[in-house]
């Protein structure tokens, strides 16, 4: 069974381990976000547990001045790929955020992620990340 819940500050090392397994992550200078207690207290970080172990996570932020939620990171442990955790994480975002628009950037070279977002109905809005990525969105 897959359970998605708010992450706890003391779980940041486990979340970083999953994040480091993810393809095409930048140098992970943003790991500060994962060790910031504020990010946990505000509910920006959630985890997906499978068989009692953290196997996936996401980090979002709901914009104040625009009616959208930004997905900064999503990751699934290599050994948990194919179990539906990524889909469950996206569904959780859609069910729990106040905005009805989710935006994200994906590396153009990451065919696995691009196929994943395509299956979930995301639309390409244009290029991002200095031409290395694509800006995607989904509305519901």
From Swiss-Prot:
Catalytic reaction(s) noted: 5-aminomethyl-dUMP in DNA + acetyl-CoA = 5-acetylaminomethyl-dUMP in DNA + CoA + H(+)
N-acetyltransferase domain sequence ranges: 2-140
Tagged with keyword Isomerase: no
Keywords: Acyltransferase, Host-virus interaction, Inhibition of host innate immune response by virus, Restriction-modification system evasion by virus, Transferase, Viral immunoevasion
Listed GO MF terms: protein-N-terminal-alanine acetyltransferase activity
Cited InterPro entries: Acyl_CoA_acyltransferase (IPR016181), GNAT_dom (IPR000182), MshD_Acetyltransferase (IPR050276)
One Gene Ontology biological process: symbiont-mediated suppression of host innate immune response
Cited function: Acetylates 5-aminomethyl-2'-deoxyuridine (5-NmdU) to produce 5-acetylaminomethyl-2'-deoxyuridine (5-AcNmdU) on DNA as a step in the pathway leading to thymidine hypermodifications in the viral genome. As a final result of the pathway of hypermodification, 5-acetylaminomethyl-2'-deoxyuridine (5-AcNmdU) substitutes for a subset of thymidines in the viral DNA. These modifications probably prevent degradation of viral genome by the host restriction-modification antiviral defense system.
UniProt protein name: 5-NmdU N-acetyltransferase
């Amino acid at each position: 069974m897959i359970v998605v819940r708010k992450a706890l500050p003391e779980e940041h090392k486990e979340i970083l381990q999953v994040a480091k397994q993810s393809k095409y992550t930048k140098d992970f200078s943003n790991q500060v976000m994962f060790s910031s207690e504020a990010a946990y207290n505000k509910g920006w970080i959630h985890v997906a547990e499978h068989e009692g172990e953290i196997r996936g996570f996401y980090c979002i932020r709901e914009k104040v001045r625009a009616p959208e939620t930004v997905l900064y990171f999503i990751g699934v442990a290599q050994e948990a790929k194919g179990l539906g955790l990524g889909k469950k994480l996206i569904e959780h975002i859609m069910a729990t955020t106040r905005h009805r628009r989710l935006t994200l950037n994906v590396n153009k070279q990451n065919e696995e992620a691009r196929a994943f977002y395509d299956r979930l109905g995301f639309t390409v809005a244009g290029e991002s990340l200095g031409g290395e990525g694509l800006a995607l969105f989904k509305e519901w």
